[in-house]
Design a protein with these regions (language model features):
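Structure-specific DNA junction-binding interface
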Residues: 1-78
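Amphipathic, charged-and-aliphatic alpha-helical interface segments
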Residues: 52, 59-64, 84-103, 124-137
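Glycine- and Gly-Pro-enriched alpha-helical subdomains that act as flexible
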Residues: 112-115
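Charged, well-structured binding/catalytic surfaces in domain cores that contact anionic ligands
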Residues: 121
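Strongly charged, low-complexity linkers/loops
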Residues: 124-160
Length: 160
């Protein structure tokens, strides 16, 4: 399927963009963060990682700024009962790193902020993905989160 698009941003609405690739406009559903990034690049070259959804009467493209967002989206839709629109909604509530940490720590309440995700669905997501995202919060932290965590541990160890 279509795994990546590079072209010119032709149009941006509240939930999707149209990327012109060689004279063909591709409608791509995106997260709010991706939308903000792309709007800043109006009429400039843009690149998106994509996930293609094909059903009986639907062919949808979902676009992401980076491979990490795409992989997390694909993890979410691997959970029975979680479709691409719900997964996109989950990605809208927090950065991927925070969502991974919440799932690894078993915090289902973080996911219930999404319309259509109740406590049962959130618990199911946590149950099915906890091992896939690391199982423990400190195993999946990276970048700034890891540095903050290490700094706090160091201060606590010194009695602060």
């Amino acid at each position: 399927m279509i795994a990546h698009l590079s072209g010119t941003l032709f149009f941006a609405s509240d939930r999707f963009v149209v990327v012109d690739v060689g004279g063909v406009g591709y409608k791509v559903r995106v997260t709010l963060d991706t939308l903000r990034e792309l709007r800043a690049k109006a009429d400039k070259k843009v690149s998106l990682w994509t996930h293609t959804v094909v059903r009986e009467d639907v062919l949808d493209l979902y676009g992401f700024q980076n491979e990490s967002e795409l992989e997390f989206f694909e993890l979410l839709i691997s959970v029975s009962g979680i479709g691409p629109k719900s997964a996109l909604g989950i990605l809208n509530i927090a950065p991927v790193e925070h969502l991974r940490e919440a799932i690894a720590q078993g915090d289902a309440s973080a996911l219930t902020k999404v319309s259509g995700i109740g406590s049962k669905s959130a618990q199911k997501i946590v149950l099915e993905l906890r091992d896939k995202v690391g199982g423990r919060g400190d195993e999946i932290m990276s970048g700034t989160l890891r540095e903050e965590h290490d700094a706090i541990e160091g201060l606590v160890a010194r009695g602060y």
